[in-house]
Amino acid sequence: MTQATQLPAGENPVKNMTDLVTEIALALVDDPDSVVVEAIAEGDCTVIRLRVSPSDVGKVIGKQGRTARSMRTILSAASMKLKHRFSLDIVEMGDPSS
């Protein structure tokens, strides 16, 4: 038996996901003022770009990428429920390539 998931009226899944990533990142970093999260629509996917200070990149990525992988797993699970694909990019603040 499959049940359709519907968002309450007025819910914005992109804002909810950016808020989620922001809260997780703020709990991990030493410099919360440097955390910037933005959503970029790319076709059928929304890229959540997380910018943190250079000293906090390692904390957000974690040993062997475990923390970043966990954040991506959470996004993936929520993506399935929302029926919209999200991906997470973690970039260093001031990185000219982003």
Residue spans for each PLM region:
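Glycine-centered tight-turn and secondary-structure capping sites
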Residues: I61-G65
